[in-house]
Structures are given as C-alpha cells and as structure tokens.
C-alpha cells in the first residue's frame, strides 16, 4: 500500500441474520400498531433462538394486534420456512411479555418540561418531551451519490443482492443467514481508490461445494454491486473462509433486537451514541433524533456547505429542546460551526414533536429499514434521506 494511504472496513448482514430477524420482528410489530394508533408508545424487544421467539417490552396503545401472527409472518417472509433450517415460522414457539410504558416516563413525554413550567412557545411542539436522555449522531459524505461512506454502502449492497439471489431462486442453494464485509483503501486525500478485501459468509445447502459458491458469487454477486474500477489483481476475496456454513440463523446463534447498531448506521465510519432503532416509536429520540441528525447532515453536504459532516444532537428526558447541537466538518467547510448551527436551528425543528412532524414519522415505515441499513437507502423513499432543505440552507448560510 502506498505511503499515506489507509484502509477502512465496514460490515453488513442479511435479513436472515439472527439479530436482524429480531430487529425486523420488533419493527413489524411497531408498524402494525402505529398503522392503527399513530400516537402509540412502543418499545418492543425481541430475542430469537432455536425454535423460540420471545417478544418483550412496554407498549401503550388502545388497539389490538396479533403479535404471534406478526412474528410468524415476518419469519416466513425472511425465508425460515423449513424445520431443517433449524427455525420454522410455522412451528416455532412465540412467547410475549408486554407491559405498559412507565407512568414516570410517560409524564415527561406527554408533557415536556417547557410545557409544565409555562415556558412553551409552540404548545403543540413543546408539549412532547424527549422519551429519554441521550446523544445521537448523523453523518454524510460526498464519496457516494447516496452521501454515505463507501465501505458500508458496498457491504449493504452485497448483503441485499445476496438476499435477492436467494429469494428469486437464482442461487437456490443459499439459505437466509449471511454476512458481508468490505475493506476500502483511501488515498492521502481521504478519497476511496480501490477495494482491498471482500468477505462473504453465506449459509448454504449442505451438498453444494465451496468452489461452486465462489464461482457463482463472482458471476452473479460482485459484478452487480461493485464497480470494476475499484477491483484489481490484488483485491482479496474470502468466501465462506471457515469452509462450511450450513448451521445458521437462530440455530447457530441467538438473536436480539438492537445488536447491529453499527450495521444500521455508518459502518463505524462515524461515531454512534449507543441507542438502537428497531421496535421504538418516534417519541424515542434514539431513533427519531438519529434520523433527524442524518437529515441535517445530508442536507449540509447536498448544499455544498461541506464535503463531510458529522452532526450530534443530545436530549434530556422530558425536555423538548435539544440540550446541545454540534457540527464537525473535518475541515471540509468554508463556514464556521456556529454559522452552520445557526442555519440548522433556523431551518430544522429538532424538538421530538418537531422531528415527528418534519419527517412525518407516525407512519408504518419502519419494518423496511430493519435490514440493510437505515441510511443511504436509494431503494426506499425515506424522509430523512431527502435533500429538500439543501437550497434553503445554502441561502441562509452563504452570504
């Protein structure tokens, strides 16, 4: 590797990975509830293991949803439909342990500190406080059209295409569990120049050879996802490097909601506040705050105000207004952090109810985000991925 160059690696997983099964179940339950009760409070956690799904959490709603049916339908859609896979949508046990949201938390969400203290400016917006304290990050970079880091973008692309090859029976020996990983080499100007390493581990039928899998992935997977200009004779490929991946899914590993937070975001390229997304209604700023931060970051880069930017927002439980906003452009902007923050504060409402209204989050849009990443999804119409405020932001800041 040339002097002053460096490598960066990100990974993704398929929708059949145990942790992603759990995420998708949690978000499918959330979608089912808020489609009938948009104001419901949902904090839904799922764990999956051999032959068993446990759904637990705190849900406050006036509607009924058939949780066991949602669980089975989700597992079936993912592809675990045969007992020989070690996990079967029809025969697995489904247990539920659901409580209501704590009244101590509810009182701060139902009526924010600003509202309770008589300091509200906009009663409807100030009325909802943050559902918890915490810090969230949003990130954007101009190294891809989707304004995402290249390593995670390619890792997601491989995982998504691999799933497509399985579900369309193009490669009918594939089974649901899979992981992908991409290592990108960056030059001295921090621009991606080549792919150094690709790792794919995919569950498969016991009778298929590893040689056949490798041949098929080089034919049907890699050319469909990765621009050939990034590949060279030194690019390394590791395909099922253990030599066998028959036992997978919940039979191989237990899965839990919220255990793939780096896969869900930027692949480690940006910092993470620690809060997971799936199973949480939009009053939970772990989710809505991170979406809003991405929305802000993406519009900053789309406006040409920076080439790369990380936005942090932080909240106190029961308080509507963020306790802090910070913006780091890594030296790629001609504008000060304060100029950017002033523009963001004028154009983006980062109070929980403001975010919910701005991004129209009280809708059943979450199940589709629970695999292959929440950001950079050109295959989905996600409100936090829009750049509709870029021009207005540019006019505010560029004098």
UniProtKB/Swiss-Prot annotation:
ATP binds at residues 17, 177-179, 244-245, 253, 259-260, 276, 280. Its cofactor is Mg(2+); K(+). It comes from the Bacteria. It is found in: Cytoplasm. L-methionine binds at residues 58, 101, 253, 284. GO terms for cellular component: cytoplasm. Its EC number is 2.5.1.6. Its main location: cytoplasm. Binds 2 divalent ions per subunit. The keyword Membrane does not apply. GO terms for biological process: one-carbon metabolic process; S-adenosylmethionine biosynthetic process. One of its GO terms (molecular function) is methionine adenosyltransferase activity. It catalyses: L-methionine + ATP + H2O = S-adenosyl-L-methionine + phosphate + diphosphate. Homotetramer; dimer of dimers. Belongs to the AdoMet synthase family. This is S-adenosylmethionine synthase. It comes from Listeria monocytogenes serotype 4a (strain HCC23).
């Amino acid at each position: 590797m040339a002097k002053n160059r460096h490598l960066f690696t990100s990974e993704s997983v398929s929708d059949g990975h145990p942790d992603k099964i759990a995420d998708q179940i949690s978000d499918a339950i959330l979608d089912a509830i808020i489609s009938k009760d948009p104001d419901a409070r949902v904090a839904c956690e799922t764990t999956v293991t051999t032959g068993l799904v446990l759904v637990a959490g705190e849900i406050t709603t006036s509607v009924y949803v058939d949780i066991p049916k949602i669980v089975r339908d989700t597992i079936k859609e993912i592809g675990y439909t045969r007992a020989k896979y070690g996990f079967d949508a029809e025969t697995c046990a489904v247990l539920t342990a659901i409580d209501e949201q704590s009244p101590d938390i509810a009182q701060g969400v139902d009526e924010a500190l600003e509202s309770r203290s008589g300091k509200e400016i906009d009663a409807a917006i100030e009325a909802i406080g943050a559902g918890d304290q915490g810090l969230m990050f949003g990130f954007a970079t101009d190294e891809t059209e989707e304004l995402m880091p290249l390593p995670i973008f390619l890792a997601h692309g491989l995982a998504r295409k691999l799933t497509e090859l399985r579900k369309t029976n193009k490669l009918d020996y594939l089974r649901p569990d899979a992981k992908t990983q991409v290592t990108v080499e960056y030059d001295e100007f921090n621009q991606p120049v080549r792919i150094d390493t690709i790792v794919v581990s995919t569950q498969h039928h016991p009778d298929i050879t590893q040689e056949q899998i490798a041949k098929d992935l080089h034919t049907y997977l890699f050319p469909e996802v990765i621009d050939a200009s990034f590949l060279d004779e030194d690019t390394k490929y590791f395909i099922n490097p253990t030599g066998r991946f028959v036992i997978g899914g919940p039979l191989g590993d237990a899965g839990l909601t919220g255990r793939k937070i780096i896969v869900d975001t930027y692949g480690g390229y940006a910092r993470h506040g620690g809060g997971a997304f799936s199973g949480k209604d939009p009053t939970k700023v772990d989710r809505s705050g991170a979406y809003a931060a991405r929305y802000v970051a993406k519009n900053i880069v789309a406006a040409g105000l920076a080439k790369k930017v990380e936005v942090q927002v932080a909240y106190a439980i029961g308080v509507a207004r963020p306790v802090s906003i910070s913006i780091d452009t890594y030296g790629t902007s001609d504008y000060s952090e304060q100029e950017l923050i002033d523009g963001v504060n004028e154009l983006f409402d980062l109070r929980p109810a403001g975010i919910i209204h701005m991004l129209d989050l009280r809708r059943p849009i979450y199940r589709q985000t629970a695999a292959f990443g929440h950001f950079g999804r050109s295959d989905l119409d996600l409100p936090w991925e829009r750049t509709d405020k870029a021009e207005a932001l540019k006019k505010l800041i560029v004098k």
